[in-house]
């Protein structure tokens, strides 16, 4: 199976910077802005975007994580952990502008699960979505507000995102 590098380290860094600027424009600054990264790689991307926003605005915005494990629609038994344990952030997200961060947007089911987790716990003013890669093939009517790169793929192909924080390198690869 052949691999194609779609984004290298420099491309990922430029993309994170662009997404940070787009989020600031969308929100007209940092007021009431919250970033929630979908575990695991979305968490690292959210932290990178937070760092870029801090460099641009000299303000550190609240950033946390969403664990969608118990909100997925492909598991049979829901756990009692489906409430407050899904979102890990040190501030209330009610009446805030929440941006969900994910590495790859594919069918939309992961995003749907993250929306369920957020709305079970809070009532944000607005929810946006940022994805490093959008590969298409949606099964739900979900669209990202901020996309790093649109990558047309076949359903048989796999898009893998590698991030330094857990993979010791930065790259987006199609297999």
From Swiss-Prot:
The answer to whether UniProt assigns keyword Ligase to this entry is no
* One GO process term, biological-process aspect: DNA-templated transcription termination
Q: Which cysteines are joined by disulfide bonds?
A: none
Q: What is its EC number?
A: 2.4.2.9
Q: Does the keyword RNA-binding apply?
A: yes
Residue numbers binding substrate: 40-41, 102-110, 135, 159
Q: Which family does it belong to?
A: Belongs to the purine/pyrimidine phosphoribosyltransferase family. PyrR subfamily.
Instruction: State the name under which the record lists this protein.
Output: Bifunctional protein PyrR
Which organism is this entry from? Staphylococcus aureus (strain Mu50 / ATCC 700699)
**Organism phylogeny:** Bacteria, Bacillati, Bacillota, Bacilli, Bacillales
